[in-house]
Amino acid sequence: MDTRPIGFLDSGVGGLTVVCELIRQLPHEKIVYIGDSARAPYGPRPKKQIKEYTWELVNFLLTQNVKMIVFACNTATAVAWEEVKAALDIPVLGVVLPGASAAIKSTTKGQVGVIGTPMTVASDIYRKKIQLLAPSVQVRSLACPKFVPIVESNEMCSSIAKKIVYDSLSPLVGKIDTLVLGCTHYPLLRPIIQNVMGPSVKLIDSGAECVRDISVLLNYFDINGNYHQKAVKHRFFTTANPEIFQEIASIWLKQKINVEHVTL
């Protein structure tokens, strides 16, 4: 038994979609979450800067005595995950491979779409992972740089959000049967995305898929938390305004949480 927390990092609030699923599946595990909303979005930034910011988040989590780090950010996974994983002596998990694997299982026509930040799409990481496992699957990738700012400003239900999502996704409509939400912010726009793509297109939440892998690693390294612990205290940190973060988090997690400000 290991009662240390699991650390989550993201460029902002998007990684809460992963946390929500973890709380549902593994309610006995403690969580420490750091969201770098002050510098979001990461997607348009240079690779060197993204790597630098990611390491700052990693080092912060290490000060919290975490037993595992989850990259709840596709951009950080694409740019820095392999380097961080090789450097640390605790498990480090990314969201890309679980999402790619789920897309392969889901597609019936071999036509998969991937939406993500400019950096995630430019890295071509999803297409590489998908076609490594299933060479016959066709992958169409599309950068959606306007989605993260919508979520970070809590405008997910606005008419502006609906127009931006419709305009952004139009190149994929009618051409795919499975769509990977290749940014953990995007599930917060899921109803609008589903409406635009149509009911026949299966949406893959890469973050939620990653929770299954978290469970596997906890078992493999024998670092599960206390299954009998009912009152688990989580900690949430943001580099931006805690009140805005708290408002979005409370809606998504369906519980009121305390958010602390941190300067990196």
Curated annotation (Swiss-Prot):
SUPFAM superfamilies: Aspartate/glutamate racemase. Pathway: Cell wall biogenesis; peptidoglycan biosynthesis. It catalyses: L-glutamate = D-glutamate. GO terms for molecular function: glutamate racemase activity. GO terms for biological process: cell wall organization; peptidoglycan biosynthetic process; regulation of cell shape. Its EC number is 5.1.1.3. This is Glutamate racemase.
